[in-house]
Regions:
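Short, compositionally biased leader-like segments
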Residues: 1-12
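Active-site- and interface-proximal helix/loop "cap" or "latch" segments in soluble metabolic
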Residues: 14-31, 36-98
């Protein structure tokens, strides 16, 4: 794959108070590498507090198409991720898309 077709995007959203991640970070960062020609998330990272949460969210995002927005991805996050940072993750994804 031609790396010139890949662009790094990041979105940040405030975390709810009282959760572990908010004690370490005040915001969550969601960072994605997007193939802009194919409109697909090639790689993802985030600043959730635990390795398993980061791994789950990143694996969920990788390979997803953003051609029609992030609504379907947000719905999948809503279904699969039942942590307190769910709304912040979805907000960060929407910021990336906008």
């Amino acid at each position: 794959m031609n790396k010139a077709k890949e662009i790094l995007f990041s979105g940040y959203a405030k975390l709810p108070t009282g959760i572990t991640a908010s004690e370490v970070y005040r915001v969550i960062g969601v960072i994605v590498l997007i193939d802009v020609e194919e409109e697909i998330i090639v790689e993802a990272d985030c600043t959730l507090a635990t390795g398993l949460a980061r791994k789950t969210v990143c694996e969920l995002l990788q390979g997803k198409s953003i051609k029609n927005g992030v609504g379907d991805i947000a719905a999948e996050v809503d279904e699969i991720y039942q942590g307190s940072a769910k709304k912040a993750i979805i907000t960060a994804l929407r910021i990336i898309y906008d």
